[in-house]
Design a protein with these regions (language model features):
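Interfacial loop-to-helix junctions that mark the boundaries of transmembrane helices
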Residues: 1-6, 95-105, 134-135, 205-209, ...
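Membrane-interface helix caps of multi-pass small-molecule transporters
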Residues: 20, 35, 88, 92, ...
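Transmembrane helix exit motif
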Residues: 60-68, 107-133, 246-261
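Selective hydrophobic functional segments
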Residues: 48-101, 190-240
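Hydrophobic alpha-helical transmembrane segments in multi-pass integral membrane proteins
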Residues: 89-93, 145-157, 193-201, 208, ...
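Selected transmembrane alpha-helices and immediately adjacent juxtamembrane segments
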Residues: 1-42, 128-179, 263-264
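Membrane-interface alpha-helices at helix entry/exit sites of multi-pass transporters
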Residues: 41-50, 72-78, 172-183
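Residues within membrane-spanning alpha-helices of integral membrane proteins
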Residues: 8, 51, 106-110, 114, ...
């Protein structure tokens, strides 16, 4: 595929939309990834290319957060070990699985996100989360983050929210502390997944740079929406875009399992 000006502009727009949505509630990749696939990139290449924008968003988000609030790096670093291991495995699976199978998995994730968004409540509205330790298995915590890493490496979309959910609901971490840990870990694990995609050549660097530019500006713009407490409008548009993405992936993306299921 020889990129044109329209391809570059669409990639910037994909990053912009992803950055805004990710800053407000997460799962911005559910918008940018279908847009990159729509440009003609194979799903695995679109997945890898999108990670450049994701890394830019998370790095800038970490820097912005660090200038305002402290981050418990020790606790986050311990949990990041299993998260990184899972991420590497998930990314390897993503570059080896057949594109048609990945498409079906991705469509399933988008549909689940739509349902979850409709029926879930905001975790930040729950005041009963504390930093007090509770009786639980630390080993299970590590296994949970290993599973989160597998998902992060393969799909990534909504990963930050899933980490936040586990930290608050399972580990009973205060929401402010969970937000800090989530911000740090998101920034840490993304380069490991990106490395796997680079290693296997599943990156379009020119479009990836455009996604990164759009994502950086989108993250800044999303933060302004949060400051103005004008996030519901963006979330409504996110739902509309997500539904359109599902329809597009189902109707216009070739999903035939003609080339097997997994490459060894």
């Amino acid at each position: 595929m020889e990129p044109t000006l329209i391809h570059y502009a669409t990639a910037v727009l994909a990053g912009l939309a992803s950055g805004i949505v990710s800053e407000i509630g997460g799962a911005g990749s559910l918008i940018s990834l279908p847009m990159l696939i729509g440009l003609g990139l194979p799903p695995s290449v679109a997945n890898g290319t999108n990670r450049i924008g994701v890394m830019t968003q998370y790095t800038m988000g970490y820097i912005r957060y660090l200038t305002r609030k402290p981050i418990p790096h020790k606790e986050a670093a311990i949990l990041s070990v299993t998260l990184v291991l899972g991420t590497v495995g998930g990314a390897y699976f993503a570059v080896r699985i057949a594109d048609a199978v990945f498409n079906w998995i991705f469509i399933g994730v988008m549909i689940l996100t739509i349902l979850f968004t409709f029926f879930s409540k905001e975790l930040t509205d729950r005041p009963d989360s504390t930093d007090d330790p509770v009786s639980r298995s630390r080993a299970v915590d590590y296994l949970v983050f290993l599973g989160l890493g597998l998902y992060c490496g393969m799909i990534q979309a909504g990963m930050a929210y899933l980490m936040f959910y586990v930290l608050v609901k399972r580990m009973h971490t205060a929401t402010k502390t969970a937000e800090a840990i989530k911000t740090y870990m998101s920034m840490i694990v993304t380069p490991f997944a990106l490395f796997i995609f680079i290693w296997f050549g599943h990156i379009d660097w020119e479009l990836g740079a455009c996604v990164a530019v759009g994502g950086g500006f989108g993250g800044w713009l999303g933060e302004k929406f949060v400051e103005r407490k004008d996030t519901h409008t963006v979330k409504d548009w996110f739902m509309v875009a997500l539904i359109i993405s599902v329809v597009y992936m189902l109707l216009f993306v070739q999903l035939h399992l003609h080339d097997g299921i997994f490459y060894l």
